[in-house]
C-alpha cells in the first residue's frame, strides 16, 4: 500500500469516499495520522463542497485515509477479497453516459475472476485520455445494475446526484437481483474493447459471486467501488 510521498499517477480518486471516511476518524487519531505525513491538519479536515479540492490537498487526505484503512480494516488481495481489497491488474474502462456525469466501469480478468470497479465519472482526474463515453439511456442499459450496486456504498450513493438520470427512483421492476447483476457485469465486461491499461487500486467490495457460463463452467465475479485507481506497470 502507499502513502503520501510514494509516487503514483492517479486517474481516479473518490472525493466522496474521502469526505465520508475522514469524518469517521476520531479527532485525536486523525491528528496523529496527519502528523505521520507532516500534513497540516487544517488541510486534511477541509470540507469538500462544490469545488474539488486542490490536488495536493486531495492526495494528503488520501494518504491519511489509506493509512487508516490499512490499520483498521481487513484489506485483502483479489484471491479472498474482504471488505476492502487491492490489486494491480490490466483493466479496460468505459463511461456510461456523459464524460463528467456518467458512471465509470473498470473491468479485467484475474485468474479466471471477472474484476469490475464501478464509480462516478466525475471523480476522474489527471491529464490522461478519458475512457470512451457511451451515451446510453436509462431504460435497457446497465445503469439500473450500477445504481443498485452503488446503493451498498454510502459515499457513492450519497454522491449519486452528480450522475445523470440518477434522480429517477429505482422500482422493484428496475432493480436486478444479485445473480442478474453478476451476469450483466459479465456481459458488459465482454463488450468493452480496446487495449488494457495497467492500474493499481484500492476498492470497497460491493458484490462477490459466481455465475455459470454457457458451457456450464463457473465464472467468479468480484465487483467493487474504488477509493483510488492509479497507473501501474501491470497489464495482464
Where are these regions (language model features)?
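Compositionally biased, low-structure terminal segments
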Residues: 5, 10-11, 38, 147, ...
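Polybasic, Ser/Thr-rich amphipathic helices
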Residues: 29-52
